Curated annotation (Swiss-Prot):
Function: Catalyzes the ATP-dependent amidation of deamido-NAD to form NAD. Uses ammonia as a nitrogen source.
Bilayer-crossing regions: none
The species this protein was found in: Escherichia coli (strain 55989 / EAEC)
Pathway: Cofactor biosynthesis; NAD(+) biosynthesis; NAD(+) from deamido-NAD(+) (ammonia route): step 1/1
Pfam families found in the cross-reference section: NAD_synthase
The protein's name: NH(3)-dependent NAD(+) synthetase
Length: 275
């Protein structure tokens, strides 16, 4: 088995999908989880205005709506959380995503004060954060806020990780990578677009250039620039297609060096890191 085949198998990626079937699969997955653990009353998700959180948010609200109708349990809710750092450049996209999702509840937590306070505390301890590390601080502060909300609403935190993100480890460890349940896992980027199109999402929300937008020195830096490879390349690779040798090498290098991000903390029983 080639490394490409191993990666595809590990991430559960498929070369082709039926959008309606995958929508149903994710919604039923969320419903089943909530029914298995009836003490869970809410799904909590940060909404950025990008493709992934828009899709995950819509699926969460669909699952909650169906469960309420089927069980009569009105205590179930989906909580969409806006988590800007100061003023967000694409705020209108966030509002458009909220309008599309129609969440039960919307909360806004501006993380700038908390991030700056943490940075100042570290500075006083003699640690000056780089812009890159400050970006990770933002991602972790966002997740911290979501877990606080989940803790106060008997909820779980929903993630947006998918195959095209997992393969490169393009998330912050214990930031946006630290969640309870990931309904998009297995899909690549173009497949996520197919699901949103089938759901009637406004096109500008999934046709915009994806960006983590964590660095102050490089605002709205496109993911594809940061990764050195396009999502079309990544999706082709995940679909088992032949890609240029340099593209495959770049993707595989990302995969191998970020393996620790896709695993629990390393113990004496692990040996993957020795390879």
């Amino acid at each position: 088995m080639t490394l490409q085949q191993q990666i595809i198998k590990a991430l559960g990626a498929k070369p082709q999908i039926n959008a309606e079937e995958e929508i149903r699969r994710s919604v039923d997955f969320l419903k089943s989880y909530l029914q298995t653990y009836p003490f869970i009353k809410s799904l909590v998700l940060g909404i950025s205005g990008g493709q992934d959180s828009t899709l995950a948010g819509k699926l969460c609200q669909m699952a909650i709506n169906e469960l309420r109708q089927e069980t009569g349990n009105e205590s179930l809710q989906f909580i969409a959380v806006r988590l800007p750092y100061g003023v967000q450049a694409d705020e209108q996209d966030c509002q458009d995503a909220i309008a599309f999702i129609q969440p039960d509840r919307v909360l806004t937590v501006n993380i700038k004060g908390a991030v700056l306070a943490s940075e100042q505390a570290l500075r006083e301890a003699g640690i000056e954060l780089s812009d890159f590390v400050r970006g990770n601080e933002k991602a972790r502060e966002r997740m911290k806020a979501q877990y606080s909300i989940a803790g106060m609403t008997s909820g779980v935190v929903v993630g947006t990780d998918h195959a095209a993100e997992a393969i490169t480890g393009f998330f912050t460890k214990y930031g946006d990578g630290g969640t309870d349940i990931n309904p998009l896992y297995r899909l690549n980027k173009r497949q996520g677009k197919q699901l949103l199109a089938a759901l009637g999402c406004p096109e500008h929300l999934y046709k915009k250039a994806p960006t983590a937008d964590l660095e102050d020195d490089r605002p709205s830096l496109p993911d594809e620039v940061a990764l050195g490879v396009t999502y079309d390349n990544i999706d082709d690779y995940l679909e088992g297609k032949n890609v240029p040798e340099q593209v495959a090498r770049t993707i595989e290098n990302w995969y191998l060096k970020t393996e620790h991000k896709r695993r629990p903390p390393i113990t004496v029983f692990d040996d993957f890191w020795k390879k």
